[in-house]
């Protein structure tokens, strides 16, 4: 019988642990990975090119569909880039709403990551627990924009509308008793801020539940400790950002180091790892959820006591209200022009970056003075992380590759763009 030393394995794109459409060619020697070669491009939708063929204000919806687990953070970078070009700033209330929803999005993303990561490694209960809390936050998206995922809520100059005075309620159903229904709708009787405040009171207890399931779990630790180790120097060289960089021990967070909107007005800490392995990155993200909860609390408190406009009054950029349009011909003209040809920006180039849940999500935009961008370049954090897959997986077992993909928090919408 002919002996062979190494063989190749196709991992994905149909593999359940491949997180979407990842195809990886693994060169194996027995159970050990000798080389990992990720193949990208299976979800390429030409988002950058599409954004270059439409007026500025008509591409916001595309941003939601990049990293489709942290929707509003993508919008934030795009909207900030346009605001920089125009030289405008959103009203302070709109900035607080944006920061609050960025942090709600961060929790949404990390819950999805934790559930999927647990499921990949074999811990199914965490997945079910995480989706219980995600449901409440999805309802916040729905209340404010009408959509559970692709909100298209941010606008250059503010947000689409102020926070609603009520929350969506569960309808009577033959599958639920009256008592169950009352319990499910108990927190939904007041305003949206009441609902979010109730969530922030409950959420730390939920995070404790996840930690009870996983943090000291013997199997969980055996699967994550000393797997996918990246040193601080190497993490910088590879272009890591977000929890991947902080997990390696580098305290870099755009919300603190280059604050945007009102991040310089809220208090929070930056969790940092020590070993740079999968387990450290898990601990960093768990602590990030607690810090996000803390920021949301501060935003809710400020928004309660400070009413005000959530959109610029300049109708050359921001559309007038429906009420104004019914009476005022000039407002109708503004509305028509905004939604047909949009607005022009001065020639120039800008880069706006936000601390998205996965890392630094940036939008580099070049304007030639027209009503649509000459060039839009999107900087996806997952791209740099996936590029390091070969280095992180080499020498590990095949089963550890799944843990490494999970710890990188890969979503292909932003990588393939």
UniProtKB/Swiss-Prot annotation:
<keyword id="KW-0472">Membrane</keyword>
<dbReference type="Pfam" id="PF00346">
    <property type="entry name" value="Complex1_49kDa"/>
</dbReference>
<keyword id="KW-0520">NAD</keyword>
<keyword id="KW-1278">Translocase</keyword>
<dbReference type="GO" id="GO:0050136">
    <property type="term" value="F:NADH:ubiquinone reductase (non-electrogenic) activity"/>
</dbReference>
<dbReference type="GO" id="GO:0051287">
    <property type="term" value="F:NAD binding"/>
</dbReference>
<comment type="similarity">
    <text>Belongs to the complex I 49 kDa subunit family.</text>
</comment>
<keyword id="KW-0830">Ubiquinone</keyword>
<keyword id="KW-0997">Cell inner membrane</keyword>
<keyword id="KW-1003">Cell membrane</keyword>
<dbReference type="InterPro" id="IPR014029">
    <property type="entry name" value="NADH_UbQ_OxRdtase_49kDa_CS"/>
</dbReference>
<dbReference type="InterPro" id="IPR001135">
    <property type="entry name" value="NADH_Q_OxRdtase_suD"/>
</dbReference>
<keyword id="KW-0813">Transport</keyword>
<dbReference type="InterPro" id="IPR022885">
    <property type="entry name" value="NDH1_su_D/H"/>
</dbReference>
<keyword id="KW-0874">Quinone</keyword>
<comment type="subunit">
    <text>NDH-1 is composed of 14 different subunits. Subunits NuoB, C, D, E, F, and G constitute the peripheral sector of the complex.</text>
</comment>
<dbReference type="GO" id="GO:0048038">
    <property type="term" value="F:quinone binding"/>
</dbReference>
<dbReference type="GO" id="GO:0005886">
    <property type="term" value="C:plasma membrane"/>
</dbReference>
<dbReference type="InterPro" id="IPR029014">
    <property type="entry name" value="NiFe-Hase_large"/>
</dbReference>
<comment type="function">
    <text>NDH-1 shuttles electrons from NADH, via FMN and iron-sulfur (Fe-S) centers, to quinones in the respiratory chain. The immediate electron acceptor for the enzyme in this species is believed to be ubiquinone. Couples the redox reaction to proton translocation (for every two electrons transferred, four hydrogen ions are translocated across the cytoplasmic membrane), and thus conserves the redox energy in a proton gradient.</text>
</comment>
<protein>
    <recommendedName>
        <fullName>NADH-quinone oxidoreductase subunit D</fullName>
        <ecNumber>7.1.1.-</ecNumber>
    </recommendedName>
</protein>
């Amino acid at each position: 019988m002919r002996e062979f030393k190494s063989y190749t394995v196709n991992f994905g794109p149909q593999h359940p642990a491949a997180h979407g459409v990842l195809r990886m060619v693994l060169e194996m020697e027995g159970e050990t990975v000798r080389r990992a070669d990720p193949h990208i491009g299976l979800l390429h939708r030409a988002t950058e090119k599409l954004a270059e063929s439409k007026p500025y204000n008509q591409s916001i919806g595309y941003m939601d569909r990049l990293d489709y687990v942290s929707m509003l953070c993508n919008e934030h970078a795009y909207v900030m880039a346009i605001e920089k070009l125009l030289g405008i700033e959103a009203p302070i209330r709109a900035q607080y709403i944006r920061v609050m929803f960025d942090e709600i999005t961060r929790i949404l993303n990390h819950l999805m990551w934790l559930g999927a990561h647990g499921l990949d490694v074999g811990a199914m209960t965490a997945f079910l627990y995480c989706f219980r809390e995600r449901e409440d936050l999805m309802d916040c998206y729905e209340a404010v924009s009408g959509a559970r995922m692709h909100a298209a809520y941010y606008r250059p100059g503010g947000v689409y509308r102020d926070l609603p005075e009520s929350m969506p309620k569960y309808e009577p159903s033959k599958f639920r008793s009256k008592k169950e229904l009352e319990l499910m709708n108990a927190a939904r009787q007041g305003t949206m801020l009441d609902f979010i405040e109730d969530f922030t009171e409950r959420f730390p207890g939920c995070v404790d539940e996840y930690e009870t399931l996983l943090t000291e779990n013997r199997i969980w630790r055996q699967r994550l400790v000393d797997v996918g180790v990246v040193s601080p120097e190497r993490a910088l060289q590879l272009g890591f950002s977000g929890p991947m960089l902080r997990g390696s021990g580098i305290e870099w967070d755009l919300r603190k180091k280059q604050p945007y909107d009102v991040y310089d007005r809220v208090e929070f800490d930056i969790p940092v790892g020590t070993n740079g392995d999968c387990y450290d990155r898990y601990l960093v993200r768990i602590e990030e959820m607690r810090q996000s909860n803390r920021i949301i609390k501060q935003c809710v408190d400020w928004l309660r006591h400070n009413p005000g406009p959530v959109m610029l009054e300049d109708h050359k950029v921001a559309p007038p209200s429906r009420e104004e349009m019914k009476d005022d011909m000039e407002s109708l003209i503004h509305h028509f022009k905004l939604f047909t040809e949009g607005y022009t920006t001065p020639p120039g180039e800008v880069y706006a970056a936000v601390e998205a849940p996965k890392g630094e999500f940036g939008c580099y935009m070049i304007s030639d003075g027209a009503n649509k961008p000459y060039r839009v370049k999107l900087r996806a954090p997952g791209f740099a992380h996936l590029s390091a897959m070969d280095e992180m997986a080499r020498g590990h077992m095949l089963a550890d590759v799944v843990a490494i993909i999970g710890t990188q928090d890969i979503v292909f919408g932003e990588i393939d763009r």
